[in-house]
Amino acid sequence: MKKWGVLGVLLLMLVILLPYKANASVLTKKGGVNYYNGQKETYYNLNMSRIYARADANFGSHHKKWIREDGVKMYGPYVVLAVNFRKYPYGTTDIPTSLGLGIALDTGAFATETNLDQVDVAVDW
């Protein structure tokens, strides 16, 4: 049996995964709503100073607060999300979204009343 080697395995993974990434939709301002990984994605644009202050106080760290070139608001390496805290407790990281891995820092009425699987992505649009 032929050995694949690291390069062969990486090439195989690329061939298998590329069609999924290429066909995956991404949340946009124009689209307004996106469905990704079994969850509904929407976006919101609010002042994040209180959200960031609470996160810094709770985590004892001061992650970089920044806005990506595509307008997505970030906390360190994570996309800032409003979610259902019963599904994703406050501070949960690595929540998959079409715009990258997120962190649960906010919530809203939508998360308890209309769609428990919805994530609201913080943006500057």
Task: Name every feature range the model reports, one short phrase each.
Residues 1-22:
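Sec-dependent N-terminal signal peptides of Gram-positive bacterial secreted proteins and lipoproteins
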